[in-house]
Structures are given as structure tokens and as C-alpha cells.
Amino acid sequence: MEQDTAAVAATVAAADATATIVVIEDEQPGPSTSQEEGAAAAATEATAATEKGEKKKEKNVSSFQLKLAAKAPKSEKEMDPEYEEKMKADRAKRFEFLLKQTELFAHFIQPSAQKSPTSPLNMKLGRPRIKKDEKQSLISAGDYRHRRTEQEEDEELLSESRKTSNVCIRFEVSPSYVKGGPLRDYQIRGLNWLISLYENGVNGILADEMGLGKTLQTIALLGYLKHYRNIPGPHMVLVPKSTLHNWMNEFKRWVPSLRVICFVGDKDARAAFIRDEMMPGEWDVCVTSYEMVIKEKSVFKKFHWRYLVIDEAHRIKNEKSKLSEIVREFKSTNRLLLTGTPLQNNLHELWALLNFLLPDVFNSADDFDSWFDTKNCLGDQKLVERLHAVLKPFLLRRIKTDVEKSLPPKKEIKIYLGLSKMQREWYTKILMKDIDVLNSSGKMDKMRLLNILMQLRKCCNHPYLFDGAEPGPPYTTDEHIVSNSGKMVVLDKLLAKLKEQGSRVLIFSQMTRLLDILEDYCMWRGYEYCRLDGQTPHEEREEAIEAFNAPNSSKFIFMLSTRAGGLGINLASADVVILYDSDWNPQVDLQAMDRAHRIGQKKPVRVFRLITDNTVEERIVERAEIKLRLDSIVIQQGRLIDQQSNKLAKEEMLQMIRHGATHVFASKESELTDEDITTILERGEKKTAEMNERLQKMGESSLRNFRMDIEQSLYKFEGEDYREKQKLGMVEWIEPPKRERKANYAVDAYFREALRVSEPKIPKAPRPPKQPNVQDFQFFPPRLFELLEKEILYYRKTIGYKVPRNPDIPNPALAQREEQKKIDGAEPLTPEETEEKEKLLTQGFTNWTKRDFNQFIKANEKYGRDDIDNIAREVEGKSPEEVMEYSAVFWERCNELQDIEKIMAQIERGEARIQRRISIKKALDAKIARYKAPFHQLRIQYGTSKGKNYTEEEDRFLICMLHKMGFDRENVYEELRQCVRNAPQFRFDWFIKSRTAMEFQRRCNTLISLIEKENMEIEERERAEKKKRATKTPMVKFSAFS
């Protein structure tokens, strides 16, 4: 807080020494107070007026705005004289202000200012009528009264009388025009800092930590301009689309006297809005999104904006981006950038922001880069101090722990958990698929490594994210959705405990498909929830937020995708944040936490981060923690982070993938335990404290040379430096698990040699010139491949072939010796073996080509393995008998195929779809059968998943028509779309008539899920009632004497 106060005080004190500072110490709330009017009169003596005069002035401003809007289309380049004069005056004050801050600005101002003929540095100060020599002679003669002429003195007095007083207003309490409640102490200081920037003609960056009220401070500044400077607008506030609603609410809540419009909508709506709302000019502030600015830039260029505010300013850090280029074309008197994340990019991106704020000062990127020497800036303390001095006048950043003492604390606990049995199987399968990458020390493809990382992270989250992993069809939502994921097991226990405590929970994940799984889980457990991701429409987004934040809301969980839900959303009614998975960039996770840990939060916030132990996740979190720690050290010192240190190197990714691989291979059993959630949390809290302590020590030792620590922390593990091992080619060999599979080694060896699957870089070994061409899908007898392999080895022996060493395989020397040993000991085929070989060559499916085989596989996928008749129709030129014979051999010997895992996955996916279609048809039949007139009587139990777009009448029509036409019919949704368009009841329903076939398919899938859930509940009730009746039925005893 002391640094914050000092920074603001230094900025204000750097104003002109002759400036008048009006301190407003106490105000009574109300629409207009005498103190306010008095302060305004003292501040702007030349323009002060009575209340009637102020209204007249405001009317004039509005008429000027209207006139500007009307004239602008004729000549966009035409500059208003008043605006031009203001810009010129601001430039002079800006240069003077910056030079008072530090002489370093002379380096930037001099070259840029000299180019402008109107530069204050090029202006002559005074007009001496007497030459220097003459004046000096008069002084030496004792004549002081004639050294300045009467004309000179008159001109100086007239010039001084024409100057307006440079007044800087400084608030001590919350301004009276702020109606939503008093500003906090640090927010008042932030407002004073913004005012001082405006008065000195300087633009700036407000970089307070998220949740400290940057929005409120910005709105208060615009209110100051209206109430104290008679500048109601026009102002533009440029924000992300997701925060439009929030900005409009904040304007209405805090400074309702500002007339605010929201520019958003489709093409027709925008055209009407421009005509009816924007061009008349009856507004002060225009709030719009980045997308709208890009689409309607010609409209926005017609205005001379008094203040241009950009929220999430990192969007313009690339000066060549479309948005950055467009906003630079707008005419604006002042500019303000808002960002909640620290400046963590390279020097050139910082220059892009400074160039946007002060293009007349920072006009050369090359000059800026050379002055701060990108390579040496982070290591040279003098350059660091120089950069800090340049940033200081423009940048204000405070963090919660320093300024917001009343905000409850935030505590993060990392919960380490194990893999389930299914997760271990899938994790092993992913690693085995790319085992050559794990054990390679040569060149690696970065995209391949990124893909492996992504697949491993999916496995850590939930194995059902992979197609074919979930048991079914039919698919059910019950205990297996929890027990097959280690994270879900812990989450299930944790949520039950939080529900008992009365907490409300935010769950963040990067994967929207995982949110689908969580939705099913919440419906199964009966938890009421809201959901928000990148596909959520703007209206539904706002409705969900309002429903969750409503007083006495019954919503227990709000699930969000990390990227979509990380910005501009206030969910302070929740007090628990669960990070289901972690982002590469720790700032994104911090943004997610700040949805709950922000002003307005009344409870301590607990953050639970789920981490799968001994997997790639452990390394990802460790790297993110190191990066965050280093960022905080550097930013607090006013430095910038070298962007190169943030890039994920290939070696780094490989170490992450390798981490824990041996542990996973060691067993196939589940690592999940029956510990209660209290024990799990205590262990996680202990490990979190240990990691924080370790990082704290690391930070202290890396203040001067932190780049080295990044490498050490990633490459040092369990006391060993893996960089040295890698240089020596001694990286530990990861032993894959022994596969329990019936293997025919002769077949495998033959096709590995023939297809060259695992050795792409080594030239093919020689083969006999007249060897037959056989394929694995032709299913020749295994004995044939033994004879062919023997023939090849003897041929290589006769020509003296020496096996080369392949550096890309494990233990190349050992593999080379074993292969050469086979060749050296080879024997020729005997006459009996040659005759046997010729006989075996006739026993395979020699008339089946690769095309026939592919058709057979696709037909199995389409119809299922048992529908031989339909499969035979798909394989051209083959009779049903031939296909049946081939199918029998295929399913008996399919493990001999090289790509059997891929083939089986393809067929099983198709069969799963077939079973799914059957189960859906049964569900629809059961639902429709319960009604005599389903088109009029059918009801759907929505629960919490109704949505706001489709009505119940529309949903009823979709389901009944889908059942009537046949769910599994080809192009059924396109036909359904035509039925909707022709239905008389929808002739005026524009919404449903404008939906596409794909949208109807998505809606029907949602409705089918609801129907299946309803059917399951009905079946369970019927079973329970049947069981109940059976227990109540009395036993009747018959007697022989009755």
C-alpha cells in the first residue's frame, strides 16, 4: 500500500509547480452539492457557471456531438479546431510532464518531436527585441531597466492572461456522483492517479490485480470528466463480448448519470441502432466488443472520442493484428488500457502498448529495442532501472494482499490422487503407442510431443474422453462414471462434504467434453448446477450467472471452461473453486480463481487443484508454479519476463511425458484408496506447503539469474541432472510392460521387415529377387512366413550383407549383433521345404486385394460383424459364401494383422453406434407408447436442462416427427428440417424455421438423453413397486382337511 501511495503521489507531484490542486475532502451524497459546484468553479474558473449554465453547456456538447456525427461521413479526415487545439496543448504538457519524471524521456522525445513543426521543443520561447550583445552592454553599464522593452513585457502579460489555470482535482473521499456506494481508499487513489494522467495529457495502463475494481475506477474517471470538466463524451469502452453485460450493469450501478449505450447485434440490428441511437448523439459512453469494432470500424471512425478505454489490453500487444491496426485509426483525445495480468511479454510487445498510448513519444520500435537491448535488459541492473523509470509514469499495478485488507483470504490446496485401473490401461496404451519417442535421444517432432501430452492429460481427467472407453451401448449414468476416474472419486467425496458445509462451488476444466461428463454426474447425484463454456450464447450466459448469484439460489455448482469463464464474470457468491485440470499458463488459473476471490466476497475462498500423481500433470503443475513464482519476482521489481523462457521446449515436453511412465508400467491395478476426504485434504495441504516452501527458497536464490533456475527445476529430479545424462546418451531406458497376447514372431518379423514400420531412416536390407508378394490380410499359413524368412536370411548370407547399426532403436549394438548372428547361421531351404513353400502359397486368400479388405472392414463397421449378407453386398465381386469364409478366418486370426488395434477400434465404434441406435429407438418407442395423441399430449421432463431457446411445443414436434420418420433413417434431420418449415403451427416462428439440420440433431440428442433418463426412472419405480407388492402379498396355506 505504501508503494501504491508513493507512486500516485509522485505522479501528482510531478504536475506543473504552478498548478492549483483542489482537494475535495468531504461530500454529502446527492445529485448536486454546493461543495461539488464550488470545487468545479475553483477548478475551471474560466468555464465555471451556474446550474443553468452547466445545462446549457451540456446541451452544447450534445449538439456538437450530433453535428460531428452528421458531418463526419463527408470528410473523415477533417479535424475539429477545438479538438486539434486540445491535442496540441496536451502534447506540450505531456512532454513537460515526462521530462520532469526522468531525463530518460529526452531520448525518445527529442528525435520524434523534432520531426513535427508544431512540437513544443521547436517553439521559440519569447521574442527578444534586443540582441544579446546590446543587452549585456546595458547591464554592464548599470542600466537594468532597459534590458526588456515595453512591447516584450506587454506580450508576456497578455500571454499569461490567456493561459487557463492548470488545475488538478484530488479526491480524499468518494465523489458524490458515484451512487452505488463509497469507493475504497485504494480506489480513490487510483482515481486520483487517472485524473492526474488526464490533466497532464498522458495516457496510461491501469494494471491492478483482478478483482480490485478497475471497472469502477474507470467509470469514476468518466464521471469526473462529466461532472467536473463538463466533458460528457463521447467516450468508447472496448471490452470482450463476455463482459458487455457486466460493464453495462456497473455503469448503471455506480454512475447512473452517464448515458450509456451498448453496441452489439447482427447486421440489421446494428444498422437500426446506428440510425436510431448512435447518430442522434443522445449518449455519453458507447460500450462495444472487439468484434463489433472490426465489423463497423467505418462508423466508429466518424467520431472524435474523448476517452478510448480498452479492457483486456493484451489483445492489442501485437501491433500488426487487425484489432490493433483498427483502434489506432480512431481519433481519440485520451486513451486508457486495462489489464489484470502483469506485463509478461517481450520488450517489443511492451513497445506496442506504449506506442498505442503515446505514439508521438514511442514512435520507433527499433530505437526502443536498441535503447533497452532485449538480450541484456534482464541481466543488466542499470537497464532494468532505466526500464522501470520509463514505465513508472504510465503504469499503476496493485495486488490484493497490499491494498484490500478487508478481503477474506484465499487458500489453495493441491490434492494428489492416483489413477483408476481403466486410466492406467489407457495411459499405458498411449505411452506404448509412442514408446519410440520415450526412449529416443534424437530429433523429435514437436507437434507429435504436444499430441502425446494432450492425450495423457485427457486420460488423467477421465478415460471416457476417449471414444470406445465407456462401457456400452447401452450407456448408463451410474457408479461407473465415478469409479473409472481417480479425480471423479475424490471430487465425489469432496462435493458431498462441501454440500454439508453449505458451500457453493465453481468447477473449472479446459475440456468442454469433460463438462458434459460432469453434467451427467450432477444429474445423477441430484446437484443443481449451471454451465458456461465457449459455445454458450450470450443471453444464456447472463441468465446462468444471475441464477447462480441470486439471493437464496438453490444452484450448488457452476461448471465453467477455464478459458471462457476466466474473464469478466463475478461469481463471488461461491466460496470454493475446484480446478479439475491446470492450464499451461498459470495466469489463466489465477483468473479462474478470481471469479470468486474478488470484492464482495464475504467468506474465505478455498481453491482445490486436482493433480494425478506420477503422471504428466505433476510436471505441468510444477512448471506452472515455477513460472508464476518467477513472474511475481520480476514484476514486483519492475522488470519484464523474457518470452523465450516461457516457451515449452521439446526436451521439456519429453521429460514431462517420461515422468512417471515406469511407475505406470509397473502395475495394472488401481491406485485408488478408500481414504476419507479429510485424510486426503490433510495430505494435500501438507504437500502444498512443502512445494510452496521449496519454491520460496528457489525464488530467493534466483533474483539475479532466474533463467538458470527454470532449467534446473525442470531437468533436476531426485538429485540427478538429466541434461548431463542426455548429453552422454544415457537417458534411462523405459521398459515397456510385457504384453499378454498370442504372438506369432515369424509373422511379426516378416512384415516388420517387409513394411519397414519401425526403421524408416535405415536403407532396406536386400531381399531375394523372385520372392512372392504376400500380405498379412491374405492370411497365409504361419509356416509360410517361417520359410520365407529363412530364405531371406540365407540370401543375405550369400551376398555377404552386414547389418548396419540403427541409432533410433533401443540398444542398437545388441540388436545389430542378434540380427547379424541370424544371418551368419542361416541355411538354405531343403527340397522338401521348397515344395512345402509352393504348396502353402496356394492356401491363402490370394484373390483378396487391399481394396477388398478395406471394403470388408468398412462393412463390418457399418453393419456389425454378424450381418454377413449386408457385408457381402458392400464387398464388390465376392459372393456371400466367400465373405463368410473370409470373415471366419479374419476373426480367428485378426491378431496377426499389423494395424489390428486401429482396425478393431474402427469396427467397435461402428457396432457401438448400431447398438446406440437400437437403444434410442426403444426409448422413443416406449415414450411415444405412453400417449394416445403424442403430438398433443407428450410431455418432457426437463429438470434443470430445459434451456431458453426451444419451447415445449417445438420439442414435442421434433420428438414425435423424429419417431414417425424413423430415427436411423438416412438424412433424417434434413427431412425433419423440411417438415418444420412446412408445419402450419410454425409459420410465424422465425427461430425454429431458421435452424439448420445440425442444430436439430443437437437438440434431438439432448431431448433423447432426457427421455432415456425419464425411462430409467420409470423402470426403477416399477421395479421398486413390484418388489414392494411381492413382499406385501400374504402366503396362502392350503390344508388337506379344509
From Swiss-Prot:
Q: Locate residues linked as Glycyl lysine isopeptide (Lys-Gly) (interchain with G-Cter in SUMO2).
A: 650, 716, 738
Instruction: Give the E.C. number(s).
Output: 3.6.4.-
Is Ubl conjugation given among the entry's keywords? yes
All residue ranges annotated as the Helicase ATP-binding domain in the record: 195-360
User: Which residue intervals define the domain Helicase C-terminal in the entry?
Assistant: 490-641
- Skewed-composition ranges (Basic and acidic residues): 51-60, 73-82, 828-837
Highest taxon in the source lineage: Eukaryota
EC class name: hydrolase
**UniProt motif DEAH box: location:** 311-314
Q: Which residues carry this modification: Phosphotyrosine?
A: 942
Q: Which SMART domains match?
A: DEXDc, HELICc, SANT
Q: Which Gene3D superfamilies match?
A: Homeodomain-like, iswi atpase, ISWI, HAND domain, P-loop containing nucleotide triphosphate hydrolases, Tandem AAA-ATPase domain
Question: Under the cellular component aspect of Gene Ontology, which terms does the record hold?
Answer: ATPase complex; CERF complex; chromatin; intracellular membrane-bounded organelle; nucleoplasm; nucleus; NURF complex
**Phosphoserine: modified positions:** 116, 119
* Chain sites annotated for binding ATP: 208-215
A GO molecular-function annotation: chromatin binding
Q: Looking at the record, which segments are called Disordered?
A: 25-82, 819-849
**What organism is the protein native to?**
Homo sapiens (Human)
Recorded family membership: Belongs to the SNF2/RAD54 helicase family. ISWI subfamily.
List GO BP terms, alphabetically: brain development; chromatin remodeling; neuron differentiation; positive regulation of DNA-templated transcription; positive regulation of transcription by RNA polymerase II; regulation of DNA-templated transcription
UniProt cross-references to Pfam families, sorted A to Z: HAND (PF09110), Helicase_C (PF00271), SLIDE (PF09111), SNF2-rel_dom (PF00176)
| Cell compartments where the protein resides | Nucleus; Chromosome
- By what name is this protein known? SWI/SNF-related matrix-associated actin-dependent regulator of chromatin subfamily A member 1
